[in-house]
Amino acid sequence: MKPMYRSRSWRRKYVRTPGGRTVIHFERKKPKIAHCAMCGRPLNGVPRGRPSELRKLPKTKKRPERPYPNLCPSCMRKVIKAQIRAGISL
């Protein structure tokens, strides 16, 4: 095993080959789930994936198609209400 693969930053995936041997394939781990910028709740509709995987997705699959996609829906409502009450236009 290469020294770079001894680190636990690589995920070990055991694969059975057609010849019957079990070999280890090393993959990078998936990043953590996206969180709301205000309250820290996990965001729905945002995929977990490495940048190389996310690059292959269409734009609409990468984040919610609404204002403030980096906020959860309840925080988004609070921000929009605060802006309207302050008289700031979007």
Swiss-Prot record:
Q: Name one GO biological process term.
A: translation
- Entry's InterPro entries? Ribosomal_eL34, Ribosomal_eL34_C_sf, Ribosomal_eL34_CS, Ribosomal_L34e_arc-type
Record's keyword annotation contains Ribonucleoprotein: yes
One of the record's GO cellular component terms: ribosome
Q: Which domain of life is it from?
A: Archaea
Q: Which residue ranges does UniProt annotate as crossing the membrane?
A: none
Keywords in alphabetical order: Ribonucleoprotein, Ribosomal protein
Q: Family per UniProt?
A: Belongs to the eukaryotic ribosomal protein eL34 family.
Per its UniProt record, what NCBIfam families does this chain match? PRK04059.1
**What name has this protein been given in UniProt?**
Large ribosomal subunit protein eL34
Name the source organism.
Thermococcus onnurineus (strain NA1)
| Gene assigned in the entry | rpl34e
